[in-house]
Amino acid sequence: MTRPKPVALCILDGWGLSERREGNAPLLADTPNMDRLMATCPHATLTTFGPDVGLPSGQMGNSEVGHTNIGAGRVVAMDLGQIDLAIEEGLFAQNSRLRAFIVTLQDSGGTAHLMGVVSDGGVHGHINHMIAAAKALADENIPVVIHALTDGRDVAPRSALGYFETLQAALPDGVEIATVTGRYFAMDRDNRWDRVSKAYQAIVTGTGRKAASASDAVDQAYGQGENDEFISPTVLGGYTGAKDNDGFFCLNFRADRAREIMAAIGDPDFTAFETGARPKWASLMGMAQYSEAHANYMTTMYPKPEIVNTLGDWVAQQGLRQYRLAETEKYPHVTFFLNGGEEVSFDGEDRLMPKSPDVATYDLQPEMSSKEVTDAFVAAIEEGYDLIVVNYANPDMVGHTGDLQAAMKACEAVDQGLGRVLAALEKAGGAMIVTADHGNCDVMIDPETGGPHTAHTLNPVPVVVVGAPDGATLRDGRLADLAPTILHLMGLESPKEMTGKCLIS
């Protein structure tokens, strides 16, 4: 048979499948192009959570996990499960890099500053990791303060008080919460440095809104209409900022939303905003490696495993050309995460990153930059690349706002783009897999509370093959099966490291 060219992978980020109509943006939206694909093309479903993507049972998937598994073509054991197991087996406190952090602070006489998301969402961090780290340090008589990042995005929008109750009941005597900051400020990934600056000032200099306690900070925020995600950086009690010889440990294990705040705290060449005189840190550490640049000034408790012969690497080894495309909110996912944690592009790999719109929240502009992404997608098809990987951010990013009407508009914007892409693909004689990395906007109303649902879901996601061989059918599978399927469409054998199986029969 004639091999299609290009072969494209189109990831509709956060587009899950559910038969429940209430709050189901993809089902309620007007999406004629996606409807046509589901009616006329081979399709099935993929599992994007739990052990099928290297996470603990019942743990929802996310974009980092999803794109890592997609690119690897195998199930990749993720940081959450690795850290959970170490805590369960009593090995967390014995970690050699944590021990080195402890010894350094014993020598310097400084305080350990622990920063991380305080929830059990498990997407960027976990409250249990905060508790384990605080205990490990306090057991060695290291003074500990906590910089709590409230979630409200991967968990219910107003759930922080319960998490603080859990945290404070488990913390050793003497460990204090020094600041409370909504993740909107401290966990930005789109160069919104005005937000990051406010988080930095509270955490490092002790400057910001004041409250007597964590619960007071939350009550104060709710009184001003701020949900957990948006709590203004708040300084508690008598905290006056970090000092020379202190140490800083970021407990978030996901890289993309830890990079900016940690660069502000520790990068010697940081210039994005005026930090003032920073403390002379005795030690800086992250739960995971946030980037190769970060590794120049901070250590890593759990270094990333090497993932060889990823989809992009394997295609490059065959001398073929590939193209990666996403707006800034999802750009790391189709590059860094899809490439198994490699920052540098492979030979023959071109990239484009349209800027995400400069709005406070994406329900205000649910189309985001989908038109620019579609324009570039169509141009890449016409350019003659062998492989194109594209992420549409809208269903996920707007899904996180909890606004059903906006999420429907997001799905419709993506579907309109899909129509243009399909026309260009048919003209070029290409093939395409349309899928998602996890669910999100398929549940916009919490079935238990009736309030907004802002987190990812445990629903399956669609997988559709456009331009499949005649008579082809698809089986249900998992994200690790996508790379072998793409390589099959390209007429390439899979490398032996890819244990995923082709979905086409």
From Swiss-Prot:
Mn(2+) 1 binds at residues 396, 400, 456. Its cofactor is Mn(2+). Signal peptide: none annotated. GO terms for molecular function: manganese ion binding; phosphoglycerate mutase activity. One of its GO terms (biological process) is glycolytic process. GO terms for cellular component: cytosol. The active site is at residue 63. Binds 2 manganese ions per subunit. Substrate binds at residues 124, 153-154, 183, 189, 254-257, 330. Keywords: Glycolysis, Isomerase, Manganese, Metal-binding. Its EC number is 5.4.2.12. Coiled coil: none annotated. PANTHER family: 2,3-BISPHOSPHOGLYCERATE-INDEPENDENT PHOSPHOGLYCERATE MUTASE (PTHR31637:SF0). This is 2,3-bisphosphoglycerate-independent phosphoglycerate mutase. It comes from Roseobacter denitrificans (strain ATCC 33942 / OCh 114).
